[in-house]
């Protein structure tokens, strides 16, 4: 595990411990189970693709550790509405505070502004965070193979599914892909950014594609910056995209989405 990821995960452990003191897991679970408003995340992607369109998971994030602040004029509800208007299949909302300047409230506001399913984008290491995701309205959670042992992956996935959510499992290489393919989720996110060097290459997705069986939906993540990137991926039958930076830097994120997948 690289230093940046290890640092983030240490902060997450502290955050979970603090949150548990503020509110018990049992109480949070009651709130999560009481919500009957799950929007089908994986299905929304498939619906777009079945229409011959790209299945775009459009991301809402103010900043990142590697790039700093991406967007000064940051209104999650306004961005979400623009994404919905311009053809996004789903939203991804950063809820990490320290490294990405996100928040739980950003997710709530984005979800309330449209009818799209929403991914809680965070570094999940504990069941408490899965329960919290559903309680705040998330329809899908991200599990990062690099951050979790195989038993943790299975247990967290099972909990998410039991709460009605979908799971996007993220990999960076062939070894991580093996762990991801052992899970039930059809959503396999391939992150094109090297966790050690932070360099990005779309070749990562292309290299892993032959190892992925039918019945799984590949989501290519990071480095999708221009229409040619989308065309390259779709030529290789990669039809789902998680895009953040390109949209966040644009004057109108939704208009940029439409331009990217035109």
Swiss-Prot record:
GO molecular function: indole-3-glycerol-phosphate synthase activity; phosphoribosylanthranilate isomerase activity
HAMAP family: IGPS_B
Record carries keyword Amino-acid biosynthesis: yes
Protein's UniProt name: Indole-3-glycerol phosphate synthase
PANTHER family the UniProt entry points to: INDOLE-3-GLYCEROL-PHOSPHATE SYNTHASE (PTHR22854:SF2), TRYPTOPHAN BIOSYNTHESIS PROTEIN (PTHR22854)
UniProtKB keywords: Amino-acid biosynthesis, Aromatic amino acid biosynthesis, Decarboxylase, Lyase, Tryptophan biosynthesis
InterPro entries: Aldolase_TIM, Indole-3-glycerol_P_synth, Indole-3-glycerol_P_synth_dom, Indole-3-GlycerolPSynthase_CS, RibuloseP-bd_barrel
Pathway named in the protein's UniProt entry: Amino-acid biosynthesis; L-tryptophan biosynthesis; L-tryptophan from chorismate: step 4/5
Disulfide bonds: none
Coiled-coil annotated spans: none
Any one GO BP annotation for this protein: L-tryptophan biosynthetic process
Domain of life: Bacteria
Pfam families reported for this sequence: IGPS
CDD domains in UniProt: IGPS (cd00331)
Native source organism of the sequence: Bordetella parapertussis (strain 12822 / ATCC BAA-587 / NCTC 13253)
Catalysis performed (reactions): 1-(2-carboxyphenylamino)-1-deoxy-D-ribulose 5-phosphate + H(+) = (1S,2R)-1-C-(indol-3-yl)glycerol 3-phosphate + CO2 + H2O
Family per record: Belongs to the TrpC family.
């Amino acid at each position: 595990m690289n230093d940046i990821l290890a640092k983030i995960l240490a902060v997450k452990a502290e955050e979970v411990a603090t949150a548990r003191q503020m509110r018990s897991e049992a109480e949070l679970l009651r709130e999560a189970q009481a919500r009957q408003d799950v929007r089908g995340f994986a299905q929304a992607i498939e619906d777009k693709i079945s229409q011959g369109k790209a299945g775009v998971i459009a991301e809402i994030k103010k900043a990142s550790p590697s790039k700093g602040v991406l967007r000064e004029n940051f209104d999650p509800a306004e961005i979400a509405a623009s994404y919905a208007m311009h053809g996004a299949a789903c939203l991804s909302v950063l809820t990490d505070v320290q490294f990405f300047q996100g928040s739980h409230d950003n997710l709530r506001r984005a979800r309330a502004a449209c009818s799209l399913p929403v991914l809680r984008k965070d570094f999940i290491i504990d069941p408490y965070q899965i329960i919290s995701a559903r309680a705040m309205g998330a329809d899908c959670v991200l599990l990062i193979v690099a951050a979790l042992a195989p038993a943790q992956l299975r247990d967290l996935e099972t909990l998410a599914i039991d709460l009605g959510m979908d799971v996007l499992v993220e990999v960076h290489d062939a070894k991580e892909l093996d762990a991801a393919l052992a899970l039930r989720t059809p959503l396999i996110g391939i992150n094109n950014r090297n966790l050690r060097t932070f360099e990005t290459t779309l070749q990562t997705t292309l290299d892993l594609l032959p190892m992925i069986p039918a019945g799984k939906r590949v989501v290519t993540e990071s480095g999708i910056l221009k229409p040619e990137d989308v065309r390259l991926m779709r030529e290789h039958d990669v039809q789902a995209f998680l895009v953040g930076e390109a949209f966040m830097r644009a004057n109108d994120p939704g208009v940029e989405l439409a331009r990217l997948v035109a």
